[in-house]
UniProtKB/Swiss-Prot annotation:
GO biological-process terms attached to the record: L-tryptophan biosynthetic process
Entry keyword Transferase: yes
Binding, Mg(2+) 1: 91, 225
Residues annotated for anthranilate 1 binding in this entry: 79, 110
The protein's name in its UniProt record: Anthranilate phosphoribosyltransferase
Cofactor note: Binds 2 magnesium ions per monomer.
Gene Ontology molecular function, alphabetical: anthranilate phosphoribosyltransferase activity; magnesium ion binding
Gene: trpD
HAMAP family for the chain: TrpD (MF_00211)
Binding site for anthranilate 2: 165
GO cellular component: cytosol
EC number annotated for this UniProt entry: 2.4.2.18
Function: Catalyzes the transfer of the phosphoribosyl group of 5-phosphorylribose-1-pyrophosphate (PRPP) to anthranilate to yield N-(5'-phosphoribosyl)-anthranilate (PRA).
Reactions accelerated catalytically: N-(5-phospho-beta-D-ribosyl)anthranilate + diphosphate = 5-phospho-alpha-D-ribose 1-diphosphate + anthranilate
Length: 341
């Protein structure tokens, strides 16, 4: 590890292979916590490259729990977090809208790291059992159309690093790679990131991971979601080509809304917001979900245009299908799925 730390101190980039090997060291028991903290801080200070991100993703996916079945057409809409905006759980709420529209959603997530309420905290509050095994997740994806992958359970080698991330209390490369380490073999992806200068590198990593189609967004105000506040910077991966775009919510019929107006709270408060949105209540929370779910449906290829994606997201909510997916996941995740274990 000393060689890698020395390179980072000197401001040098690591190659993909060096980062892969450094990643395996970070996940091992043969490294001091102080070395892990130093590595993460130095890497953040230098700035992460696409090669470094992909190298670490390779190491993490290699050490993740194995999945025997590969569900066709699975998607994730997990974002990086780390924007400090304290918004409600936009991507988790949107996940049920996607599922209601017929997308198989393998939602990767965690407890709160830099926010008040993480996706795992919200789902537990709603009554979802987040402790599903890989076989149970395969079952849920096949029969319910949505499953939650609790990151610490999927990546047991990350336990020490999670503790150090919490103590550092600043975004690190692990915020960036969270959405990229989903152990399910995804076909498409919608990723919100908190760093605008990482849009292209993250899209390049998704390309290396073999995604058929993907969309990476940095929202107005540097939100790790699409925002109603103003223009959103977007990178689209389609047909193995990467295209940069700007998305203005006003062009899709939405009014401008400041990010402060979509702040969330604790898990109880955020659960109330999520149920309200999925129940069809009109609000700025609903509009934010419609924009994000619409973009995700477009990224998935479910619709040909963003406008069609927003219409399909609206139908998913107003038909009751999105709320039904939540209720089905609550019921199915709490059943004894012995037949699949």
């Amino acid at each position: 590890m000393n060689n890698y730390l020395r390179k980072l101190v000197e401001g040098q980039h690591l190659t993909e292979e060096e980062m892969y090997k450094a990643g395996l060291l970070l996940l091992s028991e043969n490294i001091l916590e102080s070395e892990i903290a130093a590595f993460l801080v130095l890497l953040k200070a230098k700035g992460e490259t696409a090669e470094e991100i992909y190298g670490l993703v390779r190491a993490l996916r290699e050490k993740a729990l194995p999945f025997s079945n590969h569900i066709q057409g699975a998607m994730d809409n997990c974002g990086t977090g780390g924007d400090g905006a304290q918004t409600f759980n936009i991507s988790t709420t949107s996940a049920f809208v996607l599922a209601g529209a017929g997308v198989k959603v393998a939602k990767h997530g965690n407890r709160a790291v830099s926010s008040k309420t993480g996706s795992a905290d919200l789902l537990e509050e709603l009554g979802v059992n987040i402790s599903s095994t890989p076989n149970e997740i395969d079952y849920l994806l096949e029969h319910v159309g949505i499953a939650f992958l609790f990151a610490p359970a999927m990546h047991p080698a990350l336990r020490r690093i999670m503790k150090i991330r919490k103590e550092l209390n600043v975004p690190t490369i692990f915020n960036l790679i969270g959405p990229l380490t989903n152990p399910v073999n995804l076909e498409t992806q919608f990723v919100g990131i908190y760093k605008r200068d990482m849009l292209l590198p993250v899209a390049q990593v998704l390309q290396k991971l073999g995604r058929k189609q993907a969309l990476v967004v940095n929202g107005s105000g540097f939100l790790d979601e699409a925002s109603l506040q103003g223009e959103n910077q977007v990178v689209l991966l389609k047909d193995n080509e990467i295209v940069e775009m700007n998305i203005d919510p006003e062009n899709y019929g939405f009014s401008r809304v400041k990010n402060e107006e979509i702040r969330g709270g604790n898990s109880q408060e955020n659960a109330k917001i999520t149920v309200g949105v999925l129940s069809g209540e009109k609000s700025v929370y609903r509009d934010t979900v419609l924009l994000n779910a619409g973009l995700a449906l477009f990224a998935n290829g479910k619709t040909e245009t963003i406008e069609e994606g927003i219409k399909l997201a609206t139908h998913s909510i107003d038909s009751g299908k999105a709320l039904t997916k939540l209720n089905l996941l609550i019921a199915a995740s709490n059943e004894k799925l012995e037949r699949v274990n």
